[in-house]
Amino acid sequence: MVKESDILVVGGGHAGIEASLVAAKMGARVHLITMLIDTIGLASCNPAIGGLGKGHLTKEVDVLGGAMGIITDNSGLQYRVLNASKGPAVRGTRAQIDMDTYRIFARNLVLSTPNLSVSQEMTESLIIKNDEVVGVTTNINNTYKAKKVIITTGTFLKGVVHIGEHQNQNGRFGENASNSLALNLRELGFKVDRLKTGTCPRVAGNSIDFEGLEEHFGDTNPPYFSYKTKDFNPTQLSCFITYTNPITHQIIRDNFHRAPLFSGQIEGIGPRYCPSIEDKINRFSEKERHQLFLEPQTIHKSEYYINGLSTSLPLDVQEKVIHSIKGLENALITRYGYAIEYDFIQPTELTHTLETKKIKGLYLAGQINGTTGYEEAAAQGLMAGINAVLALKNQAPFILKRNEAYIGVLIDDLITKGTNEPYRMFTSRAEYRLLLREDNTLFRLGEHAYRLGLMEQDFYKELEKDKQAIQENLKRLKECVLTPSKEVLKRLNELDENPINDKMDGVSLLARDSFNIEKMRSFFSFLAPLNERVLEQIKIECKYNIYIEKQHENIAKMDSMLKVSIPKGFVFKGIPGLSLEAVEKLEKFRPKSLFEASEISGITPANLDVLHLYIHLRKNS
């Protein structure tokens, strides 16, 4: 049976959901093929969305028309701002989610979206003609024709689950691996490697002794992810903190020989920033304890996820380990921890649109590209979906720069550097993080969303008014000169503010931590009518004014540098500071400008600086 659509999406995880929904929203006829409709949107690992860097991604996905933020706001159990005591650039919103509610909400959204159809089957191979994808075949002899195909298979490509010595060919515990498609992708000549990730055991809530455990609350004023969320008054359940101890560690050490991670059974490389408990005990042998969070999986609190105890140790060892931990002495394990090893394609095989270089019309998103995490997957799925539609319409691709969004950092890192371990987003990966804050996501990306048809016109008009108000009032504050006159000192004293001893502008005054929004409105009458969103931006811009201006200068310099032409016949060999790999790639592709050089996989900003210097030196000589 042959069926046709504009875009096919393979896989109903977090990347597949965003790719399907955004493409349908932009007017394409989309068909989603997934192994099990009931697992669309399943949170396979921890019951949480967001965090440091990840919260930024979630909010960016939301502004650009994605669904993760609104689903989370409708299914959360606890909401917090991480790093709340630090600067706004490194704060991250995080929510514990009800895994059942999240999955049901996501599934219903997918099933009720116009232009989007869904079928339950397994994709087995791609149909390729003249190096262009034209469709797929499935395990029930269906053939689907499409102009674009987006693969979002997660950990299912040749997936193997490990629990102790036992191995099963699963893409997730109890679910079949996708072996035929994995073989097909290898046969097409893609550079395929193996990665490993893992998950933690879950225990029955009524078997935990919470007495004496540290209770972890949500924020009094809970943050939310989606700008569309109104009247937010969510459930706030507690999490609990406990710790491993020397007895726990000895049990694990005594069973290192039975751990797939150390026995050679697992070959794939695991996530650096989410190591298994056996890896932590091995690498940090001097530590006497490791922190664990007991997180409710649903509002019913019937199961708790033991965050920090990812493991693939044998079942009997997992029992001993858990029962050695305070509060879990009599815990009943409902689901054991396991490791999963799977195929991924080196993301250097992709362009910035997430289309493969080898096969036209084929896009990859999510863990197939070597990332880890729901948020990283959602961001890639969204971008693949948008770009697949734009390609259908013969319109220019949508590529976010590193100075525009964490999504830009994520994709640029993947396609230029590749990865040999599961890639996770952190704020430290963004060199322009002062400009890429959670609080200014709407102002950064609203114009893009509106242009793509992913933001309502009325809302965008209000956003533009706010943006203009921010710029105009910052200018006014810079021009507003304050002197230590009697009137100024009196007004500062009334606001319980320290006096000024010298001349200063309004921006410098508002840079004070103590000068809150209420004081801003009181001291500067022209700020009084402005809404909270505008005043918050003005406050942050004033506080970090010097650093923000410096980052804008660096961006301008980089933009100017990328316009520099590389002379015809330029010799790259022998330039100090250029690695052999960089020289080989530059000689092979012969870029005509530094911008073209920056698009080559493996060419770093440091390489561009060196090239810029030597082009300048050779021109002068």
From Swiss-Prot:
Binding site for NAD(+): 270-284
Keyword annotations: Cytoplasm, FAD, Flavoprotein, NAD, tRNA processing
Name of protein: tRNA uridine 5-carboxymethylaminomethyl modification enzyme MnmG
Any GO BP: tRNA methylation
Cited PROSITE patterns: GIDA_1, GIDA_2
A Gene Ontology term for the protein's cellular component: cytosol
Subcellular location: Cytoplasm
GO MF term (any one): flavin adenine dinucleotide binding
Lineage of source species: Bacteria, Pseudomonadati, Campylobacterota, Epsilonproteobacteria, Campylobacterales
A Pfam family matched in the record: GIDA
Keyword Ligase assigned: no
The family this protein is said to belong to: Belongs to the MnmG family.
List of residues binding FAD: G11, G12, G13, H14, A15, G16
Species per Swiss-Prot/TrEMBL record: Helicobacter pylori (strain G27)
SMART domains in the record: GIDA_assoc_3
UniProt function note: NAD-binding protein involved in the addition of a carboxymethylaminomethyl (cmnm) group at the wobble position (U34) of certain tRNAs, forming tRNA-cmnm(5)s(2)U34.
Subunit structure: Homodimer. Heterotetramer of two MnmE and two MnmG subunits.
Cofactor: FAD
